[in-house]
């Protein structure tokens, strides 16, 4: 049996080796013209990997399936069961390498509907926590965050307009606006204020999110 050097490297506590970080987003979802269809997965992965590097917790990868409210039609999504099954796979394999606490960093609002099923995976020796970053879809904050991560096309901001792409701010998603008051309020804000790139805010927001998740890891170990 090999003796592993758990104290080696840039970690803040040996107990962090019992902690796993999972990214959750979406891979197939329209985000206007300036952001890619896998924006949520890339932002979640970027934050999760940086939190892993900063803390020493293990980055276990990104969940491939994603889900969504049935009335939000701006991409291709999967069932809640599909998402939970993939998370179970990561958790089961994480347990094999000594992980008993899992932090899921979710950057897709539709995935919040898995919470009830996700809670059923918890047990006395396995704890799973999901923390979400839910920004107005493809709008100012997400555009600015996408710039900070490095996935935004600044040239395409010229055509990144909800009048052209209905999913921006969900302005043109009539059914979603009718059935979800929060979505409608965000859409009205985008209609009133427009969408613009704020590079300074994007960098600040990214830094704040990473710092916040680092603190969550500290509190979980």
Curated annotation (Swiss-Prot):
Gene: arfB
Swiss-Prot/TrEMBL keywords: Hydrolase, Iron, Metal-binding, Zinc
Protein name: 2-amino-5-formylamino-6-ribosylaminopyrimidin-4(3H)-one 5'-monophosphate deformylase
GO BP terms in the entry: F420-0 metabolic process; riboflavin biosynthetic process
Physiological role: Catalyzes the hydrolysis of the formamide of 2-amino-5-formylamino-6-ribosylamino-4(3H)-pyrimidinone 5'-monophosphate (FAPy) to form 2,5-diamino-6-ribosylamino-4(3H)-pyrimidinone 5'-phosphate (APy).
First-tier enzyme category under EC: hydrolase
Residue pairs linked by disulfide bridges in the UniProt entry: none
Species, as recorded: Methanococcus maripaludis (strain C5 / ATCC BAA-1333)
Superkingdom to which the source organism belongs: Archaea
Cofactor dependence: Fe(2+); Zn(2+)
Pathway assigned in UniProt: Cofactor biosynthesis; coenzyme F420 biosynthesis; Cofactor biosynthesis; riboflavin biosynthesis
UniProt KW Transmembrane helix keyword: no
Catalysis: reaction(s): 2-amino-5-formylamino-6-(5-phospho-D-ribosylamino)pyrimidin-4(3H)-one + H2O = 2,5-diamino-6-(1-D-ribosylamino)pyrimidin-4(3H)-one 5'-phosphate + formate + H(+)
Residues annotated as transmembrane: none
Gene Ontology molecular functions: 2-amino-5-formylamino-6-(5-phosphoribosylamino)pyrimidin-4(3H)-one formate-lyase activity; ferrous iron binding
Residues at which Fe cation 1 binds: 29, 40, 108
Subunit field text: Homodimer.
